[in-house]
Amino acid sequence: MPLVRYRKVVILGYRCVGKTSLAHQFVEGEFSEGYDPTVENTYSKIVTLGKDEFHLHLVDTAGQDEYSILPYSFIIGVHGYVLVYSVTSLHSFQVIESLYQKLHEGHGKTRVPVVLVGNKADLSPEREVQAVEGKKLAESWGATFMESSARENQLTQGIFTKVIQEIARVENSYGQERRCHLM
């Protein structure tokens, strides 16, 4: 029986970008058309990747804006982040840049495990942010970029699988930097 590894992931983004819908679709396998603003919810799910099992603890946050102060609970003990914007809102994309900077400053690390998600891809006729813009931003951070649709269950599983992989990648890269070589 494989060892179950605990991973805490915080989902951040501007309001009404679909953070709750992504988490709910991933954990419950369903999409809710109704919208109640989130204060803060948590979800848990066991995810198997290869031979490894992960207890994924998701923190679904209330919408942030560029002036939001991120509480320490969004930084301390957190392994990775899913930063979500809506492809139908340029403002939500701009807020994501500010949130990433706050995370980066809060962690004091050069690398923070992040998956950048352009959600609501099913609403392409209303698109304000092109996929190439999201990809370029993610590349500048050294992060992964994905577009999704919580409504159509497009890549919801892949987002959270990818954040687990990003956490491992960043943890392994720090481990390599700290190795001592005796000669």
From Swiss-Prot:
Removed propeptide positions: 181-183
Keyword Magnesium: yes
Keyword Signal among UniProt keywords: no
GO cellular component: cytoplasm; endomembrane system; plasma membrane
Tissue spec. comment: Ubiquitously expressed. Expression increased at least 2-fold in several tumor cell lines.
Pfam families according to UniProt: Ras
Subcellular location: Endomembrane system; Cytoplasm
Modified residues (Cysteine methyl ester): C180
Membrane spanning stretches: none
The protein's Enzyme Commission number: 3.6.5.-
Membrane topology of this protein: Lipid-anchor
GO molecular function per UniProt: GDP binding; GTP binding; GTPase activity; metal ion binding
Catalytic activity entry: GTP + H2O = GDP + phosphate + H(+)
Binding site for GTP: 16-21, 32-38, 63, 119-122, 149-150
Gene3D superfamilies: P-loop containing nucleotide triphosphate hydrolases (3.40.50.300)
Main location: membrane
SUPFAM superfamilies in the record: P-loop containing nucleoside triphosphate hydrolases
Motif Effector region per UniProt: ranges: 35-43
Binding site for Mg(2+): T38
A biological process from GO: positive regulation of NF-kappaB transcription factor activity
NCBIfam families: small_GTP
Assembly and oligomerization: Interacts with MTOR.
Function of the molecule: Binds GTP and exhibits intrinsic GTPase activity. May activate NF-kappa-B-mediated gene transcription. Promotes signal transduction through MTOR, activates RPS6KB1, and is a downstream target of the small GTPase-activating proteins TSC1 and TSC2.
Sequence similarity: Belongs to the small GTPase superfamily. Rheb family.
Name of the protein this chain belongs to: GTPase RhebL1
Source organism (scientific name): Homo sapiens
Gene designation: RHEBL1
